[in-house]
Amino acid sequence: MLLAKHLTGSELIKQFIPYAMKTTNTYAYTQTGANLADFASVQILWSVSAWKNSGQGSYLLYLRAAADVLSGLCQPVEREGKEHGEGVSVDYAINQHNALNGSQYCMQLYSGSYGAELLNRIVEGAVVLVSEFSLTATAMSELVNVVVEGMGWMGYASRMDFHVNGRAISRGVPSNAHIAKWAEVLLPFADTANKEALNELIRRTIGDESNNQYYSGGRLFWVNDYLAHIGSHYCVWAKAISTRTVGGESGNGENPKGYYMGAGTCFLTHHGKEYEGIQPVWDWQRLPGTTVEQVPNFKWPNTAWGVNMWGSHDFAGGVSDGKRTLLSMELSRKNVTHAYKTVMATDDRVTCMGTGIDTRSVMFPVVTCVNQCIARGPVRYLTIDNQEHTLEQGSLTADNIQAVYHDGFVYTLAYFRSRPTVTIEVKSRSGAWSDININGSPYTVTLPVFSLCIHHQKGENGSYCYSVSPSEDLLDGALLPTATVFEAGMADEHIVYDGEAVMVSCFDAELTRRWAQEAGHGFYPEQPCVYIAEQQDAQVKLTCADPTQTLENLAFVIKADERGTPLVRLVVRLPQGDERGRSVTVNFLID
């Protein structure tokens, strides 16, 4: 660019253009996604420069080629295609730097960092490329879908979710302000419904979440094992990992402590500042939603470019019927193994549960972190004798706490066998951005931090269960228990009933079948799966998915005799190819 600025037209043609054509083009390299979009943007510059300074129309062929590349980048890629899943996926999330584990590429969710760069380049191109050089109508339609169906669910109250930023989480506070710019450019290309969604996005990016219509309910991004749910007064994002996906990466000296990101991490927000700048002071062994052994002076594993960030099992994924969203996984990581973990979200509540947690091999305490966020105001908590207490600073560990209030959320603690021991902590923590990013500031940052953790005894069948509700007060009616685990052997089925529908994660179908027969229930799945069933009179609306992404069908027993022998089965055909893992909805009648 410096050469282009200072050279004459003839010198440009002789020196700059040949150099640019050789080093930055869309036809001689194997770039994908955002990296390919960068090359296309530079090719637009040098092709126009060459044409204007030489008068040779042949250079416009390179301009058209760059436009074709940008159009192609708007289209979903195949997970097992030549891009190895890097770019826009069929669920309209964006992947980049997918990590190779053996012979399989594991998807890395990167909508907020590389994805933002990709969309910036495409939108810039769409603005300047006109007439015969315009992006195709199909490309612009798909670009609208990427913004509306993808990006729009990943931001709330002017902030972007940590999960979608990869190693860029170590650079600063992720904002979603750029979405408004894209939405404004795309409005002329959108149909009526998407115009309404884009206008809602423009309003939301300035922090106004007061009147969401389109962005109400949930989305499950099946390619990346990722949940986004926007309730009436809050938003939750959760990430699972499997043999198909990773939770992030380190690289170039960035994000060396991100090993547990995606391992059940769950972030809650209602005003957007819950995690404002917390990264340098975080205890990275206590990320919200994770169940982790607390190892002193922990040596962080190598996670360069996603290595070791993949999950341990096929079972990871979820289901959404629009109003309710569920994400589950089985995970073994370090000495904490075979944990069944689930997040279930409705309009006014998030329920999180874990069972079957094997900690027999650990050397140090194991905790499930309910939350670790910026402390705002005192913490109030309720003991089992219904006495209210306040913790302004310090740490409290007890086994008689039933609910905790902090910064607009009530955390209700349930239990399966015995009441859990929990630790509430409010204290200042210090760190530096350079601790998590080689290019970060070395100056010490000190912030007040609230954390709530559940302790696990050493053994083979650990568990936890809690719900979180947006609330203005500790005793604001948010304490009704909503989560129930029907224990079959090792609690292999997680169930929540919200008054209208039942949300279920079935990890072991055989134990579920035995429990259903013993309990006299006539409806149960015949294989591990996740589903939401809503009954209205004699009709049941069933939304289901296969988290292993290996099955062609799901079978459900909907009627059995008194001995539990199946009489009527429902077989649901599942999507295949790049759609595998997507939810399917069917309706059936019951007697």
Annotate each PLM feature.
Residues 54-65, 471-476, 577-581:
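Alpha-helix capping and helix-coil boundary motifs
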Residues 223, 402, 462-467, 575-591:
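C-terminal beta-strand-rich structural cap/linker in extracellular carbohydrate-active enzymes
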Residues 1-175:
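Aromatic-lined, polymer-binding surfaces characteristic
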Residues 1-4, 43, 122, 495-497, ...:
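Generic low-polarity alpha-helical segments
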Residues 564-570:
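Surface-exposed loop/edge segments in extracytoplasmic proteins
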Residues 542, 556, 572, 586-588:
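Preference for bulky hydrophobic residues occupying beta-strand positions
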Residues 118, 125-564:
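Extended polysaccharide-engagement surfaces of secreted carbohydrate-active enzymes
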